[in-house]
Amino acid sequence: VANSQPIRVGLMGFGQTGRQLYELASRSDDIEIVAIADIGAPKILHYLLCSEIKESERHTLEGNFLVNPRFKSRLIHIDRPEAMPWDIYGVDVVIDATGKYREARDMQAHLDNGAPRVILRSLPVDSIDRIIVPGVNDQAAMVSDRMISAGSATSSALCLLLKILSSRFEIECASMTSVHAYTSDQALQDYAGSDFRRSRSAAENIIPNTHEAHLWLHEILPEMSDKVLTYVLNVPIHEGCLLDTNIVMKDAKVGIEDVNDAMRSAAEDYPGIVGFTDDPIVSSDVIGSSLSLLFDTKGTVKAGTQTIKTLSWYENIGHAARLLDVVRLYSTLESKGEVA
């Protein structure tokens, strides 16, 4: 980042993604979390942070401030965008990590309260300025963007896979199933919700679910628009996800090793974002990986003449790392604008 001053980030939501963002920022040299909006009690928020990270002694609670060796963050008992006075804290950007406020009007509320720019941790509900997936469409970012989504962990993994393979081979169509750890909006016991299947216990069931990634491909990866279907199976594990993708190639000559070689090369082209493994790993082996996509070469098989099935791994902290990459991307654009 060209700017010598740390990027001042405001954070709404201190759930799993919020805590991962905070921990990653505390180990960076260019980002500071200056304010955190969450209705949790400060002692409990600090307790949850320390319970799931290494070197928890780095983080202390001093009154209403979370403190680490790099910066201190004010904890504010607020949970709605329209109630949070971001202007008081002089933030450069706000990350909404709640997963709840995905409409443009919610993002506008952040802007109205002093956030120069707001980035969603999830896909939006309606039209916003930009969806940016690092490694896929970084070049689409514009300094005028104010309401931005960084996609989701699943959409990032899928778009990276499709971009890499479609740059090497002609793809007819594809279908993706994410075998996904349960999420915080699922109930541990059967509980009447808005969706029949998601009303069943997350701890006891494999739960089929829809996924919206394919609906946004026209913005993120236009060449794959209308060629992909996406689906999710939520399973009873805490962390670690598997992307099971079936790709129909136009050229029947494309084989298993062609695909594996393409992904091995991509690991060099996308350092820190894409990797590969030749080991027979399972979901717990990917926990803690900050990659957006870890390609499993042992999972590549061919069915018939044109269908290639691939397996790729990812976990939520990889998406948290990409959120901070999007923060850096826009900070760099701002700095270039100032120089110009």
Walk through the language-model features, giving the residues of each.
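N-terminal Rossmann-like NAD(P) cofactor-binding subdomain of oxidoreductases
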Residues: 2-188, 192-199, 333-337
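Glycine-rich beta-alpha junction loops
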Residues: 39-42, 124-125, 152-154, 178-185, ...
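Short, flexible turn/loop "capping" segments at secondary-structure junctions
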Residues: 140-142, 198, 236-241, 302-305
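A short glycine-threonine-serine/GTX helix/turn-capping micro-motif
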Residues: 148-149, 201-207, 229-235
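Oxidoreductase and adenylate-handling cofactor-binding alpha/beta cores
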Residues: 156-175, 212-229, 326
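Glycine-rich phosphate/diphosphate-binding loops and the adjacent beta-loop-alpha structural elements
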Residues: 194-205, 237-248
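Active-site pocket-shaping loop/turn-to-helix segments
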Residues: 205-210, 281
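C-terminal active-site/capping subdomain that shapes the small-molecule cofactor and substrate pocket
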Residues: 230, 242, 246-340
